[in-house]
A protein has these predicted regions:
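Short alpha-helical DNA-recognition segment
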Residues: 16-34
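Short amphipathic recognition helices of helix-turn-helix/homeodomain-type DNA-binding modules
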Residues: 61-69
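A short, Lys/Arg-rich alpha-helix, primarily the initiator
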Residues: 1-20
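Hydrophobic micro-packing sites on short alpha-helices
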Residues: 49-51, 61-62
Length: 69
């Protein structure tokens, strides 16, 4: 299973917020933003910062996808 951040990108569109604005508002590092863009694993702390910034829950920004399908 791998993490998918498609929900995060859709939420940003819905909130009319750019990835750059999320980066600044959440205080995430550039390397964490790059990991998110590449669909790589990020820390729970990074996900917590995003949730606080967007006023949402973790299930609103990430889902786990079965790679075997």
């Amino acid at each position: 299973m791998r993490a998918s951040y498609k929900k995060l990108w859709k939420l940003l569109v819905d909130k009319d917020m750019s990835k750059g604005n999320l980066h600044k508002a959440s205080g995430l590092s550039s390397s964490t933003m790059t990991k998110l863009r590449k669909g790589e694993d990020v820390s729970m702390e990074a996900l917590r910062k995003i949730c606080i910034c967007l006023g949402c829950n973790i299930g609103d920004i990430v889902e786990f996808v079965d790679e075997s399908k």
